[in-house]
Regions:
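Short beta-strand-to-loop capping motifs
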Residues: 4-10
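Short alpha-helical segments enriched in small residues
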Residues: 11-195
Length: 195
């Protein structure tokens, strides 16, 4: 996250803002100066969408960041912390055989987590994360710092992504929550179905 501060008279500020939006408009949070979590809440609220979270390695940090925003109850109703495999199965419906075959930190598991959260919550967008925060855990194929993300959208399928953040636990959790929130900004307003 980068903060840009513009200083000058009103005309210079408007010109600077226009130039900034021209150069990096897709990456600028609205309203200008908003935190990422506030931008997510305002964005979802503006579209009339509800969100849910299914978290493993972040231990509820994504949900915490969303609910730190006043008015977030208008967009956020459900969050699961499913640290253990049993919780992923019992609470989100992740098939035990998928966990056994692929392990908790895998694309099939995180996809099932997001889709389970979407189904159980009735939300429009659900984000799920599962990773090895470290310093322990991980394998040679999936070392500490490996994390899988999934964003399930009621009107647009599920998107998955794997990232590697070799950091201390707290930095890892912050980076994962940041990426998870950014992905929620891809939610789109449901389209009317016509026959």
């Amino acid at each position: 996250e980068v903060d840009v501060r513009l200083v000058g008279n009103e005309v210079a500020l408007k010109q600077g803002e226009a130039r900034l939006l021209t150069l990096a408009g897709a990456y600028v949070l609205r309203p200008l100066g908003a935190t990422l979590e506030r931008a997510v809440v305002l964005y979802l609220k503006g579209l009339g969408l509800k969100a849910a979270t299914a978290e493993s390695c972040t231990g509820g940090l994504i949900a915490k960041r969303i609910t730190d925003v006043p008015g977030s109850s208008g967009v956020f109703e459900f969050g699961w912390v499913t640290y253990a495999d049993r919780a992923k199965t019992e609470m989100l419906g992740v098939p035990a055989e998928v966990l056994e075959e692929h392990g908790a930190v895998s694309e099939p598991v995180v996809k099932a987590m997001a889709e389970g959260a979407l189904e159980r919550s009735g939300a429009d967008v659900a984000v799920a994360v599962s990773g090895f925060a470290g310093p322990d855990g991980g394998t040679p194929e999936k070392p500490a710092g490996t994390v899988w993300f999934a964003w399930a959208f009621r009107n647009g399928g599920t998107v998955t992504e794997m990232m590697f953040y070799p950091r201390d636990r707290e930095s890892f959790r912050q980076m994962v929550s940041q990426k998870a929130l950014i992905g929620m900004l891809a939610a789109r307003k449901p389209q009317a179905v016509t026959e």
